[in-house]
């Protein structure tokens, strides 16, 4: 542990070996992503990820060499509860038509989100992990000529590496429970949502690209990430306004008296072996939201007695 003025201010008496960082109980990596836990009883990382591992591969291991970070890190603070952005990346494709319509109309984010797509699915992979997909025929990439040409070029390699499941749909966004998210369209971004209390979240965001991608593709992804999903990005501003508004509304006395409706697609999801997940019956569904909050409620209710998380089937209390 480095200590400025150790001799002058502490008179050399501070026992640095006792006051270092608290060590984590487990630390492991998957495809270049590092995960840690303070729980010595937690399952191994690979067991914790389960089927989610393959979906991470579609973002981070689709080409030989994996991915790399392009540029630096963006950090900013949003006055919202951390679960709002986590659930947004987990399964909320429904809001795009109105929240981001102005950005879509400028052409900065692509128009695939507002096109009919009966093949897309919301996939709940257990332990609160979630993925959104679009149909395999949908273009789900930043509207950049360099990126679109590159994606068409590498598709055969991706199919060889990832297998036939890739032909069922294209993963576009997701959340590894609790607070790690990734996004493919409009940019390539990964996020960590750091709670700073119940009403504030610190965002750490990076843009990534395949290591094997040519420089012009990496540049296009970096610019798209800044324009669309940077702290001042067109899509990001819309989302932050929504999350902040939801958090502020949830503070109210009246809001706390009423349940929030999370019934979209309720009872129509099913386990789909081909996806290795509980899949919605349509592209838009709140099945992933329910899975996310169900797992969160179970963790919060541990030791609180039976029935502590009852009533969560189709509604969530503020």
Predicted regions and their residues:
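C-terminal catalytic domain of Rieske-type non-heme iron oxygenases
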Residues: 25-318
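Short Fe-S-cluster ligation motifs
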Residues: 2-34
